[in-house]
């Protein structure tokens, strides 16, 4: 954190470190350490731009261009610079200027290797007065090309997410078409940003523009905004027969951005792409239809009436505030709280499974502490109460864990977690029940009681001359005795567990029926006593 004195000193120096010979230039504000795949905020450089006296308290408009490397992002940004400088100096409509003038600004060149690393902003912040009379600060942002040979998916996701989180207009620069993998990458990157912002229930980002470069099908969809919007509507359309994953991608994009647009831009010309000597002069190489569409695209993005201030949580952000958000966001991505992105499908599944496993472990550990292996028998009512308490604790942990995929995607994993917790609870109940002394000796007690009762009944019936009934009781005594001996052997040897389970179930059924009959008789006797009536057996006398 910069002290007030240091902040003032940094701001008073302006963007001197980023300028050569007193001229504005690009300033590196997020540095990528490619070997360590880590990120560093150049706080001094960022402060030198955003804390200049004349703009620090103005609401800021941040226009960012992001996308795959070597697709002309810096090239487009330099035309934006030309437009802004033209409006600053004289404001006439011919902002493209002298056709003999080379294109300067953000570093760009033809070739196959990326030119920009990390995130850069232009050192001069433009002040623009909107039609309503409000003055705003306009910042242009350039990003590292995604998916170069040295960048991991996490590198790309972090850079794209940071630029999207801090910009009011994110231009997604694509080549030739909007492919399905472009949408999936966008879903992954924006979800990575939404995780860091803790935005779940509202749209965390503002404007997304798909800028499709080198559009080759003007006979299907015209160049420009109108053709682009028609093309985008078709590409992002959600249909019933589509696979769930494809539907989720489209729903996710609409849920993340308040406004989504598309602009189709023609190829600038073959010589622009192939000539090593091209320096951006409009007179040379650049196709007329490309220049024509540029004169529509750039004013559409930067016209004072179109400028949209950066908002976070519904509040407009000043240049001073943007610096603080940069510092807060970079700390999140430097930490270990966020999941490591792989692909959207892998990341969401693995991340949610990990969160569910962690929550399940919390429940299991908590229950083990009160009714685990060596813990004494616990009352079923207390066990149920603790189950509900620890279940809620586990669910709260799952909900609070940062997860990819959004609330709807995570809900199915929450349901699975609840089912697994229920299974664990049933196992804990069985284990707890086995600790009950009466439960342990329930089966032999029932069998022994049955043997004793039947033996006495056999003697009585034999005494009064009912030999057949007495022999029947004796047979039943023999069967119960065999069952008792068998149960004891099974308990001792651990064999024939199914037969032992059947004997236990039979004993439990007999005990349940006897208890139910005694309970009903007792309740009836109590009711009769309260009502002042004689018991049913006395009535019959």
Swiss-Prot record:
Where does this protein hold GDP?
A: 70-75, 109, 213-214, 272, 275
What's this protein's family per the entry?
Belongs to the TRAFAC class dynamin-like GTPase superfamily. GB1/RHD3 GTPase family. GB1 subfamily.
Q: Where is this region: N-terminal hypervariable region (HVR)?
A: 1-25
Q: Which GO terms describe its biological process?
A: endoplasmic reticulum membrane fusion; endoplasmic reticulum organization; endoplasmic reticulum tubular network membrane organization; Golgi organization; positive regulation of endoplasmic reticulum tubular network organization; protein homooligomerization
**Entry binding sites for Mg(2+):** 142
Q: Please give the residue ranges the record annotates as the region Disordered.
A: 1-22
User: Do you know which PANTHER family this protein is assigned to?
Assistant: GUANYLATE BINDING PROTEIN (PTHR10751)
What's the source species' lineage? Eukaryota, Metazoa, Chordata, Craniata, Vertebrata
Give the UniProt keywords, A-Z: Acetylation, Endoplasmic reticulum, GTP-binding, Hydrolase, Magnesium, Membrane, Metal-binding, Nucleotide-binding, Transmembrane, Transmembrane helix
EC identifiers of the protein: 3.6.5.-
Q: Which residues carry this modification: N6-acetyllysine?
A: 391
Please indicate which superkingdom the organism of origin belongs to.
Eukaryota
**Species in which this protein is naturally found:** Rattus norvegicus
Entry's Gene Ontology molecular function annotations:
GTP binding; GTPase activity; GTPase-dependent fusogenic activity; identical protein binding
The membrane topology of this protein is: Multi-pass membrane protein
What top-tier enzyme class does this entry carry?
hydrolase
Comment on protein domains: The GB1/RHD3-type G domain mediates GTP-binding and hydrolysis as well as homodimerization.
Which InterPro entries does the record match to this protein? G_GB1_RHD3_dom, Guanylate-bd_C_sf, Guanylate-bd_N, P-loop_NTPase
Q: What this chain does, per the record?
A: Atlastin-3 (ATL3) is a membrane-anchored GTPase that mediates the GTP-dependent fusion of endoplasmic reticulum (ER) membranes, maintaining the continuous ER network. It facilitates the formation of three-way junctions where ER tubules intersect. Two atlastin-3 on neighboring ER tubules bind GTP and form loose homodimers through the GB1/RHD3-type G domains and 3HB regions. Upon GTP hydrolysis, the 3HB regions tighten, pulling the membranes together to drive their fusion. After fusion, the homodimer disassembles upon release of inorganic phosphate (Pi).
- The ranges of region (3HB (three-helix bundle) domain) come to 344-434
Q: Any idea what this protein is called?
A: Atlastin-3
Q: What residue ranges lie in the Cytoplasmic compartment?
A: 1-445, 489-541
Q: Does the record's keyword annotation contain Endoplasmic reticulum?
A: yes
Q: Where in the cell is it found?
A: Endoplasmic reticulum membrane
Subunit composition and interactions:
Monomeric and homodimeric. The homodimer, transiently formed by two molecules on opposing membranes, is the active form mediating ER membrane fusion. Interacts with ZFYVE27; both proteins are involved in endoplasmic reticulum tubular network organization. Interacts with REEP5; both proteins are involved in endoplasmic reticulum tubular network organization.
């Amino acid at each position: 954190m910069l002290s007030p004195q240091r902040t003032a000193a940094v701001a008073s120096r302006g963007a001197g470190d980023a300028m050569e010979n007193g001229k504005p230039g690009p300033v590196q504000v997020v540095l990528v350490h490619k070997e360590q795949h880590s990120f560093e905020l150049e706080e001094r450089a960022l402060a030198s731009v955003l804390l200049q006296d004349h703009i620090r308290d103005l609401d800021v408009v941040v226009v960012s261009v992001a996308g795959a490397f070597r697709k002309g992002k810096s090239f487009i940004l330099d035309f934006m610079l030309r437009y802004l400088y033209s409006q600053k100096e004289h404001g006439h409509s011919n902002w493209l200027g002298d056709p003999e003038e080379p294109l300067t600004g953000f570093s760009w060149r033809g070739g196959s290797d990326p030119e920009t690393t990390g995130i850069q902003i232009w050192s001069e912040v433009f002040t623009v007065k909107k039609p309503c009379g409000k003055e705003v600060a306009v910042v242009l942002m350039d990003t590292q090309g995604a998916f170069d040979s040295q960048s991991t998916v996490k590198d790309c996701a972090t850079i794209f997410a940071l630029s999207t989180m801090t910009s009011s207009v994110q231009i997604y620069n694509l080549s030739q078409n909007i492919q399905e993998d472009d949408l999936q990458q966008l879903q992954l990157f924006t979800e990575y940003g939404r995780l860091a912002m803790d935005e779940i229930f509202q749209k965390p980002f503002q404007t997304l523009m798909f800028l499709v470069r080198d559009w080759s099908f003007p006979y299907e969809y015209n160049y420009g905004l109108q053709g682009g919007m028609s093309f985008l509507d078709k590409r992002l359309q959600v249909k019933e027969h589509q696979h769930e994953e494809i539907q989720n991608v489209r729903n996710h994009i609409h849920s993340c951005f308040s406004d989504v647009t598309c602009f189709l831009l023609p190829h600038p010309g073959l010589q622009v792409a192939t000539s090593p000597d091209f320096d951006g002069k409009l007179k040379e190489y650049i196709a007329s239809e490309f220049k024509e569409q540029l004169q529509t695209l750039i004013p559409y993005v930067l016209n004072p009436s179109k400028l949209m201030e950066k908002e976070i949580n519904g509040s407009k952000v000043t240049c001073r505030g943007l610096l603080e958000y940069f510092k807060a966001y970079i700390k999140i991505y430097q930490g270990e709280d966020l999941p490591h992105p792989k692909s959207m499908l892998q990341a969401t599944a693995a991340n949610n499974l990990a969160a569910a496993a962690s929550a399940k472990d919390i429940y299991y550990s908590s229950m083990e502490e009160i009714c685990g292996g060596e813990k004494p028998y616990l009352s079923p009512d207390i066990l149920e109460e603790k189950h509900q308490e620890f279940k809620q604790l586990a669910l709260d942990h799952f909900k609070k864990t940062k997860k990819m995929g959004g609330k709807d995607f995570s809900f199915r994993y929450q349901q699975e977690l609840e089912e697994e917790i229920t299974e664990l609870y049933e196992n804990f109940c069985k284990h707890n029940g086995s600790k009950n002394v009466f439960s342990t000796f329930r089966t032999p007690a029932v069998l022994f009681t049955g043997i004793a009762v039947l033996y006495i009944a056999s003697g009585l019936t034999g005494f009064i001359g009912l030999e057949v009934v007495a022999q029947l009781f004796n047979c039943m005594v023999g069967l119960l005795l065999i069952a008792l001996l068998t149960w004891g052997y099974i308990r001792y040897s651990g064999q024939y567990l199914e037969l032992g389970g059947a004997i236990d179930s039979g004993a439990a059924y007999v005990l349940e029926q006897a208890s139910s009959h005694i309970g009903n008789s007792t309740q009836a006797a109590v009711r009769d006593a309260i009502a002042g009536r004689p018991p049913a057996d006395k009535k019959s006398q």
